Amino acid sequence: VIIKALAFGLSLLLAGCAGASGQEPVKVTAGRFLSALASGDHGSACALLAPRARESWAPADCEGGIAGANVPDGVPETVSVWSEEAQVKTARDTLFLHESPTGWLITGAGCRHRNEQVYDCVVGGP
């Protein structure tokens, strides 16, 4: 019983450490997306969108669509990760991400919460 308790405690400790390091790739992706938008590099911003977020526009018009989406600028402040899903908050925006086999992708940006569980996003959604 003691060994099981120690093993469980060690696994919790390791999970806590992994959680903090697991936030960095999410924060980097969100930062790259926001920087691309701020600099007008809509092609790079579109490349960071998950397919379901790009579905907001015709396949050939992601760049035009995202240029007119008015996603608030900002820098990532808080990051929450739940397995393959993540949320990043800036001072004026909430972004949602999904971990794909190639890395983290933006699934929603320009999101404002309507209530505790529902978000409206100008790009994609949660």
Where are these regions (language model features)?
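C-terminal motif of bacterial Sec signal peptides marking the signal peptidase cleavage site
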Residues: 13-16
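Short intrinsically disordered, low-complexity segments
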Residues: 9-11, 90
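Exposed beta-sheet edge and beta->alpha loop/turn motif
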Residues: 69-126
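Sec-dependent signal peptide recognition
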Residues: 1-8
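Short solvent-exposed beta->alpha transition segments
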Residues: 20-85
